[in-house]
UniProtKB/Swiss-Prot annotation:
Its EC number is 3.4.19.12. Residues 101-611 form the USP domain. Residues 333-342 have a biased composition (Low complexity). One of its GO terms (cellular component) is perinuclear region of cytoplasm. The UBP-type zinc finger binds 3 zinc ions. However, it does not bind ubiquitin, probably because the conserved Arg in position 55 is replaced by a Glu residue. Residues 242-254 have a biased composition (Gly residues). GO terms for molecular function: cysteine-type deubiquitinase activity; cysteine-type endopeptidase activity; zinc ion binding. The gene is usp20. Keywords: Cytoplasm, Cytoskeleton, Endocytosis, Hydrolase, Metal-binding, Protease, Repeat, Thiol protease, Ubl conjugation pathway, Zinc, Zinc-finger. Residues 205-254, 315-342 are annotated as: Disordered. Residues 613-706, 715-818 form the DUSP domain. This is Ubiquitin carboxyl-terminal hydrolase 20. It comes from Xenopus laevis. The keyword Signal does not apply.
Length: 840
């Protein structure tokens, strides 16, 4: 972090001003107009004691600066660290920086406290909740994003307490997932996934499609589908060091000062919006394959089913996954543990963004949120048939990587494979890679030789995080019980499955699989895994098509578990963004530690952030431009959310103003009343620099309510009212019937979607009526109700009304057949005659 004098060379011209002097002047009045505070500005020029009012009054402070020019620029607070109120670092921060606030244990809640502290020390996420409060809005219960925003504000407030009690968030997470109810110890990784999935669900925004990008995506899909005979090498980066793969797995707006408050000298990270849109199409909703030939067998959703007993498990974010059968693939004999035995208890993983099965024609809507922007990456999984060489591809979105901890035999096999591949690929991947490969080979050989001289029972196998990554991405043979069902061969074949990273996330969450749960017992793998504090390089694991330029990561936080598989305690080590020091967060106790303590920790979950010196220089340049008085005739509005990305992302991507614009270029009517929370005003020079550097847009010089959206909203409200009123009227008439001749059945799954739409809980109308899950079609073609089906009963008029609007089917009618009533004596006589006739 740059020193203050390095940031501004004009500080030498400032006179000696004490804190008491400033407090006294803040209680005074403007020397020109006599107005009182709080918006007063004191001139810090040596020998000048002037105090003037700010721009909310007559702005005499600016007039004074113009009359008595000095080499110092009157910046309106450009802090260089995370803050809740835009103030620069104070003397108090030098003693105890913000963010060093503990959390009280609310009964075995250390798993939650450790996870929240780790997330709190992820600057991209924390800055969003501190600076972009206007986007933290939701109508969905339990509004966990509001609870989290409040918690982050308390943790990073300048008047922070020694510890806080996260009771609101604690109760909210219990409402979402029954797994966390009660006071038993839970898995911190399960909590992280549940929390981030819910935050995404509450904060998600639909992605506005663009025709040009859609055409490009379709062309890319077509190219992917033409890879029928592609080999593994076609998908590997030339920087790879070995066999890679495996695929499991309008109102008032902000002022210039607001813009300056958001431009900070922090280490920032990011990703391209165009790339993000492209990957979302391939990974959101159903994790559909990227080619028409891609197999459904390879489309695995590890977040929805019990985790297979294999080494290559990847948590696919539920935002982009849908339930499918899993191809259980066993990789090594010493299989690493599952993170939790309760994988099937995830009730929160089903998302509205998913395309519902059963012939539904509902248009596919893709979503994004701050969670997906920061934590989502994508992996290209490939399965190759060894008979016909057909390659099936799948692009999967991941929120975290669950890595195996390889055993001694696995390490030997892994290193042997890597060394062989290094020798083979050194001549084909360029001189720089060859030199790097041989140097790594020699150093690794020496290290392994030294370790081999010491008894393994004393030293144990040396395992690095890179070893775990290599084990995760190692090729997996599909044979025996795990043979591959090839669509081209139409039978089971031997195959190979491998995967590569297609897009790297801004913050990489890595989960080490330390816990293994069997039917009769559970145990914990206590092997030490060494991990780098800086410079984690993922380039060897990238696909050639990878869109991420920055591939190195620095450690932000690490969560550790002390104890056994059945009991224990969670703590976290986090690096403070203000002073760069490492701290141990143990519930309500926060202690500074040396980085060697962190390196020797038994890591369970690690958070890495993209590192980029170029991004820091870009922010320095923008700060300098913002401080200059030269400005054009135009002022530009820019998304506060994108500006936060620029401040905290390594790759912020093109400028995107879609957070406050509609598809027609105006302000959506529902956002206009808080538009000042969504935008920041930029001077022309700053906008031109950012636009020339990053592209994107669109440029916005005037804010207005979109009249087209207003008409659409009114028409939608009218449609909803008409449909729900008509349904209530028809249903009342149906309830009044004593013996209806026919009753129609309707799928409750579809009905719940329609109900959510007409009650304005869902913005999109449902697709056609889908009764396929409750209908049973016999060989004769007759359709009847499936036994135990989830259905509702409606009248014929109601069915016809909904059918005329939405279409669909099939029709399932239950007809009442009433036998003709006959007199008992007459019937008895007929039966007697019939019996006598038979006897005769």
């Amino acid at each position: 972090m740059a020193d203050a004098e390095d940031f501004c060379p004009h500080l030498d011209s400032i006179g000696e001003v004490t804190k008491e002097d400033l407090i006294l002047k803040s209680k005074g009045t403007c020397e020109s107009c006599g107005v009182g505070g709080p918006n007063l500005w004191a001139c810090l020029q040596d020998g000048c004691q002037s105090v003037g009012c700010g721009e909310s009054y007559a702005d005499h402070s600016t007039l004074h600066a113009q009359d008595f020019p000095s080499p110092a620029h009157p910046l309106k607070s450009v802090p260089i660290a995370v803050g809740d109120d835009g103030e620069s670092e104070s003397d108090e921060d030098d003693i105890k920086p913000r963010g060093l606030t503990g959390m009280k244990n609310i009964g075995n809640s250390c798993y939650m406290n450790a996870a929240l502290q780790a997330l709190s020390n992820c600057p991209p996420l924390t800055q969003f909740f501190l600076e972009c409060g206007g986007l933290v809005r939701t109508d969905k219960k339990p509004a966990l994003c509001k609870s989290y925003q409040k918690l982050v504000s308390e943790l990073w407030h300048k008047k922070r307490p020694s510890y806080v009690v996260p009771s609101s968030l604690y109760h909210g997470i219990k409402l979402i997932n029954p797994l966390f109810r009660g006071y038993s110890q839970q898995d911190t990784q399960e909590f992280l996934r549940c929390l981030m999935d819910q935050l995404h669900e509450e904060l998600k925004e639909p992605i506005l499609p663009e025709n040009q990008e859609q055409e490009e995506e379709e062309r890319d899909d077509q190219r992917e589908g033409e890879r029928g005979g592609t080999t593994e090498e076609d998908f590997l980066s030339c920087d790879s060091g070995g066999e890679m793969g495996d695929g499991e797995g309008g109102g008032g707006v902000g002022t210039l000062s607001e813009m300056e408050l958001l431009i900070r000298e922090e280490v920032g990270r990011g990703l391209s919006e165009k790339e993000k849109l492209k990957e979302r199409k391939l990974s959101y909703c159903h994790r559909r394959t990227s080619s028409e030939q891609a197999d459904e067998d390879a489309d695995v959703d590890t977040a929805m089913i019990p985790e297979p007993d294999n080494d290559a498990y990847m948590h696919c974010s539920s935002r982009s996954c849908s339930p499918h059968p899993v191809e259980s693939i066993s990789k090594h004999s010493s299989t690493p543990p599952r993170s939790s035995p309760l994988r099937t208890a995830h009730s929160y993983v089903l998302k509205k963004a998913q395309v519902l099965s059963g012939g539904k024609k509902r248009s596919e809507v893709r979503y994004r949120s701050v969670i997906s922007d920061i934590f989502d990456g994508s992996i290209l999984s490939l399965v190759q048939c060894l008979t016909c060489d057909r390659v099936s591809t799948t692009i999967e979105t991941f929120q975290d990587l669950s890595l195996p901890i390889p055993g001694k035999e696995d390490l030997a096999k892994l290193h042997s494979t890597i060394h062989q591949s290094t020798v083979i690929k050194a001549g084909t991947c360029g001189d720089s890679y060859a030199a790097q490969g041989w140097l790594a080979f020699v150093m690794d050989y020496i290290r392994r030789f030294v370790v081999s001289c010491i008894p393994s029972w004393f030293w144990g196998p040396m395992i690095t995080l890179e070893d775990c990554l290599a084990a995760f991405f190692a090729a997996d043979e599909l044979k025996g019980d795990n043979m591959y069902s090839c669509e081209r061969c139409k039978k089971l074949r031997n195959g190979v499955k491998y995967c590569k990273v297609l897009r790297l996330p801004e913050v990489l969450c890595i989960h080490l699989k330390r816990f293994r749960h069997e039917v009769m017992y559970s145990f914990k793998i206590g092997s030490h895994v060494s991990f780098p504090l800086e410079g984690l390089n993922l380039r060897p694991f990238l696909a050639k098509e990878c869109v991420s330029r920055i591939t190195t990561y620095d450690l932000l936080a690490v969560i550790c578990h002390h104890g056994s598989a059945s009991s224990g305690h969670y703590i976290s080590y986090c690096q403070n963004v203000i002073n760069g020091q490492w701290y141990e967060f143990d519930d309500q106790y926060v202690t500074e530690v040396h980085e060697t303590v962190v390196q020797n920790a038994e890591a369970y979950v690690l958070f890495y952030r993209k590192s980029s010196e170029e991004a820091e220089r870009e922010r320095q340049k923008v700060v300098s431009l913002a401080a200059m008085k030269e400005s054009g005739l135009l002022q530009f509005y820019i998304s506060r959310e994108w500006l936060n990305k620029f401040n905290t992302f390594a790759e912020p991507g093109p400028i995107s103003n879609q957070s406050f614009l509609c598809a027609h270029g105006g302000i959506p009517p529902n956002k206009y009343h808080y538009i000042d929370d969504l935008v920041v005003i930029l001077p022309q020079s700053v906008w031109e620099y950012l636009y020339n550097r990053f592209g994107g847009g669109p440029a916005v010089n005037h804010l207005y309510v979109c009249s087209i959206c207003q008409v659409e909203i009114e028409a939608l409200a009218k449609r909803r009212k008409t449909e729900i009123d008509t349904f209530i009227k028809l249903n009342k008439a149906f309830q009044a019937e004593e013996a209806p001749s026919v009753i129609y059945c309707i799928s409750m799954q579809w009905f719940r979607e329609w109900e959510a739409f007409v009650k304005a809980k869902d913005s999109d109308p449902p697709g056609p009526i889908d009764n396929s899950k409750v209908a049973l079609t016999k060989s004769s073609g007759h359709v009847q109700l499936k036994q135990g089906a989830d259905y509702g009963q409606i009248s014929e008029e109601t069915w016809n009304y909904l059918l005329n609007i939405y279409g669909g089917g099939p029709e399932i009618a239950i007809r009442q057949t009433v036998a003709q009533y006959q007199d008992p004596e007459h019937l008895h006589g007929e039966q007697k005659i019939e019996a006598e006739t038979r006897a005769g």
